Amino acid sequence: MQLQFKGTNYELTPEVTDQVTKKFDRVKKYLGTREDNAHAYIDMGKVTEAHVSGNVWYADCNLKVAGKQYYAKAEAVSLRNAVDKMVGELGREIRSAQAKEKSLLRKKGSLLKDFFRFGR
């Protein structure tokens, strides 16, 4: 998986990028063999320079895997919390899409089976 980082209103440090890379191991396990051709574009930073308290930090990610695109965004009090929320949301998006694909495959298989059993 290729990760590209961008910082908005914030200077990214190597510690932050290492932390995000470790967090993305949770996402990699859902991708399986499709992990090799996955590209993640991650944007992290402060909402505005003027905000001092509240949900000041945000993290969003566009993940492109095998022609499909997944998007997750989160805002939180700290950058670490925003990254945690974003990775969790991205994992839910991927699992949901995989469940839909599996359901459609089963439905199509059932229809095909019924079609071939019609003549009996």
Regions found by a protein language model. Name each.
Residues 1-120:
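N-terminal, polar/charged subdomain of small-to-medium soluble alpha/beta proteins
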